[in-house]
Swiss-Prot record:
InterPro entries: Metallo-B-lactamas, RibonucZ/Hydroxyglut_hydro, RNase_Z/BN. Disulfide bonds: none annotated. Coiled coil: none annotated. This is Ribonuclease Z. The gene is rnz. Zn(2+) 2 binds at D67, H68, D207, H265.
Amino acid sequence: MKRARFVVLGSGAASPAPERALPAHYFEYEGVGALLDCGEGTQFQLMKAKISFSRIKVVFVSHLHGDHVLGLPGLLQTMAMASRRDELLVIGPKGLKDFLLSSFELTYFYPPYPIKVVEVLRDAEITYRNLKLKVFPVNHTVPAFGVSVETASKRKVRADVLEREGLPKRLWGRLQRGEDVVWEGRVFKYEDFTFEGERIKVVYSGDTAPCERLVEEAEGADLLVHEATFTKELKEEAHDRGHSTAEDAATAAARAGVKQLLMVHFSARYKDLRRHLEEARRVFPRSYAAEDLTKVVILK
């Protein structure tokens, strides 16, 4: 059985609030962790969630507004103080590399471990070990991206069929690797005798107003993590500022046919999220409002 976990480290928006940290989220599958955005204070939230910094192999920055990125230089320095030696993959928009290099230079920081920065201009698909990250543009006031994180899937053999056909088990592994097998003059095509195992798919919106591309990329996801900065009476303001309402998030979830919606990125003006939930559940019943350190475990 596949098991992944998603942890909301910071459920707030641009203005900090005592009860809500700035945007940051963590996805982990088979020991490989991906940090999705890194607002100020993310280090403290990781410690509260008991997530080891060394488990973070990939960092995705959705855009360069401060509430999504200003926690990253400090986190990278703390990783160095913890004697990190593993490479860290950092993915984000154009300008992220200059931002990091400037912060390193001005704070006299010389990373003792390799940091690979991949800047995305439009679309990108990046595979890291057992994770496939698909980065796509969303609808914000500055260049901004959402991301689909999908677990790798190993092909599985149709054991009952292969046993009936008499193919020796020692050859099954080749079919699993996507190779055709010739045995006793017969060709066994891998696509006829194997099938794709189930994948776990989580999609994170970053900051966005309603976005058709996001709906397309979220299709069938196990979890859609979507910003819901405002409720619908502030819909016009939300869209003008490149943000979504709870109703917008639920509409995206319903159209994409996702299994669950987790709303995040709440304006500091909201102390009570009941209106967000009521608004969203009228459109998509499986809607939830995140608190800091909310954890979702996905099993398949």
